[in-house]
């Protein structure tokens, strides 16, 4: 009769010991690093920036590093000098025109990574525009004969030029017609699929369908139209869009900035895949965060 009592007492003592020591065990947190990165931007708005920052902060948190955000100053040289004086580990640029700051930072020696653009001689992280061009054209040719497909280029957009360059061979093989975008461009008759190679032209074409200035039976394939992308897809204003992954771009940019600061990275271009989003796949788990970034 005593044996069950002894076992019960032992179980109680074990439970007390687990409560005292087991639940007080603390998981080691990453050691705080002195590395400090600055994301330099033109403005502090938009879902793209929000997701980019999440990617940066996630990559930094793994090694206990810090990321702050600053807006571009009117005095670029003074701002670059301040980065150097305050021992910033690296600067990550998300700027419409990064050239002046790149020049200023080169004079201070502060490592720099460019996001969203490909600039020779620098570490850059952007979407895979060459792949995006191929994906758009492949979808277009699956929807209509080459004679019904019109490619709309945009020479003012560097990323558009990369997309068009990637499809030159297919353009020639299929004798596809290209049209340079302008604010007063005229879309000739006889085409059912419009392939827009820039965000600007895609946005205007979608607005044209919405307003009735363009026929509603056009199939428009293009580049991410921004925070209205879900409405554009749901409303049939566009048939499919290639979309950047800003979270992945931010994560990769931070990793490359760390390597660059340690002297372990040559200048090069690093790209993130740009999935093709349409009404059939926009609600898949892997695409929801790209289509509805504000919900994340």
Protein language model features and the residues they cover:
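Hydrophobic alpha-helical segments within soluble ligand-binding/sensing domains
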Residues: 124-148, 227-229, 244-262
């Amino acid at each position: 009769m005593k044996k069950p009592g002894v076992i019960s007492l032992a179980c109680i003592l074990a439970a007390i010991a687990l409560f005292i020591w087991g639940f007080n065990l603390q998981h080691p947190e990453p050691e705080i690093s002195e590395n400090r990165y600055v994301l330099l931007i033109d403005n502090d708005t938009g879902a793209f920036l929000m997701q980019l920052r999440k990617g940066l902060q996630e990559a930094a948190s793994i090694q206990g590093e810090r990321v702050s955000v600053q807006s571009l100053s009117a005095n670029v040289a003074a701002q670059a000098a301040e980065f150097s004086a305050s021992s910033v580990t690296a600067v990550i640029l998300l700027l419409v025109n990064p050239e002046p700051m790149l020049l200023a930072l080169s004079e201070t020696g502060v490592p720099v990574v460019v996001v969203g653009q490909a600039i020779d001689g620098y570490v850059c992280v952007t979407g895979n525009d060459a792949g995006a061009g191929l994906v758009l054209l492949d979808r277009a040719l699956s929807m209509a004969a080459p004679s019904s497909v019109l490619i709309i280029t945009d020479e003012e957009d560097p990323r558009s030029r990369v997309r068009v360059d990637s499809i030159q061979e297919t353009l020639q093989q299929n004798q596809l017609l290209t049209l340079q975008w302008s604010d007063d461009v005229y879309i000739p008759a006889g085409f059912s699929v419009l392939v827009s190679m820039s965000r600007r032209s895609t946005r205007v074409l979608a607005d044209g369908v919405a307003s009735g200035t363009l026929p509603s039976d056009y199939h428009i394939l293009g580049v991410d139209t921004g925070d209205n992308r879900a409405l554009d897809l749901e409303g049939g204003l566009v048939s499919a869009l290639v979309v950047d992954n800003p979270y992945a771009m931010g994560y990769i940019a931070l990793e490359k900035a760390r390597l660059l600061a340690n002297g372990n990275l040559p200048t090069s271009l690093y790209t993130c895949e740009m999935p093709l989003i349409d009404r059939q796949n926009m609600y898949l788990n892997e695409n929801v965060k790209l289509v509805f970034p504000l919900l994340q």
